[in-house]
């Protein structure tokens, strides 16, 4: 559209292999990239909020996708028939994986669903023939149906998944795996992470703001896990704003 916030449709005939969506775009229309069979990579903008239905349907040469922070939902059939899709990174702002979102992604071998994902709709990972591992970090994630995750359907119409579901002890992932005879590996007991608690003392205090300030000044280095905890304002970056927000929470009400 005119203000460059809504990408309505991508020119399929354009033949581009790599494409960068403008940073001004906050929404990509349904079917916008459908059938773009030359596209191998696409960089999505940090301000994107929603991936609508069938947005990348049958982008058969697409190899990887990074879902940025801010996106809350992956629409139905969003990446269906992306046969060459090997790598998917989902941000911890996504709450829903839509119906058939990754259906027939035959090159996808592993995917991690962050704790933010609370709903996996029916057929989300149907017929993903090489999928061998799915990590589900939300212990209370909701699943819809026995054919939500499977590799293929056998001659008796059974939905077969030869891979492994990873989840926490006594989680809904474990319940799903046991109900539908899927392999399950426990990630251990679930411990809720307190965002901002860098010191690990169970509360947010001045020490946490100081540790973030040290990292900003190069006096210490955060692990990837610590970066997620330190990103207090959840903008995808650990910076001075996180330390300021923590300090604000400590001010008298």
Residue ranges and their predicted role:
Residues 189-253:
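Cellulosome-associated attachment modules in secreted, modular CAZymes
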Residues 37, 58-60, 81-83, 104-106, ...:
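Intrinsic low-complexity repeat tracts in disordered regions, enriched in small/polar residues
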Residues 172-193:
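A recurrent domain-boundary module in secreted/ectodomain proteins
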Residues 147-152:
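A structural signal for leucine-rich repeat
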Residues 1-5, 10-27, 36-50, 60-73, ...:
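Structural signature of tandem-repeat unit edges
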Residues 29-34, 52-57, 75-80, 98-103, ...:
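Consensus positions within tandem repeat domains that build extended binding/scaffold surfaces
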């Amino acid at each position: 559209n005119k203000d460059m916030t809504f990408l309505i449709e991508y020119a399929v005939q354009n033949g581009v292999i790599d494409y960068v969506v403008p940073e001004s775009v906050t929404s990509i229309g349904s079917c916008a990239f459908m059938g773009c069979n030359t596209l191998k990579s696409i960089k999505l903008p940090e301000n994107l909020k929603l991936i609508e239905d069938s947005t990348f349907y049958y982008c058969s040469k697409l190899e990887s996708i990074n879902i940025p922070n801010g996106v809350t939902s992956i629409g139905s059939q969003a990446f269906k028939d992306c046969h060459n899709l090997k790598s998917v990174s989902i941000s911890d702002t996504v709450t829903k994986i839509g119906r058939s979102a990754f259906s027939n992604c035959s090159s996808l071998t592993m995917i991690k669903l962050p704790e933010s994902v609370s709903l996996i709709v029916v057929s989300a990972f149907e017929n993903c023939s090489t999928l061998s591992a799915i990590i589900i970090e939300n212990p209370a994630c909701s699943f819809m149906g026995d054919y939500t995750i499977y590799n293929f359907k056998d001659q008796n119409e059974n939905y077969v998944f030869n891979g492994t579901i990873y989840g926490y002890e006594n989680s809904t992932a474990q319940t799903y795996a046991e109900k539908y005879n899927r392999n399950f590996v426990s990630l251990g007991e679930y411990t809720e992470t307190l965002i901002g608690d860098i010191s690990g003392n169970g509360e947010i205090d001045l020490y946490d703001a100081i540790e973030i300030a040290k990292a900003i000044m190069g006096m210490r280095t955060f692990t990837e896990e610590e970066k997620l905890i330190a990103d207090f304002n959840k903008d995808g970056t650990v910076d001075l704003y996180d330390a300021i927000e923590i300090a604000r929470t400590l001010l008298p009400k």
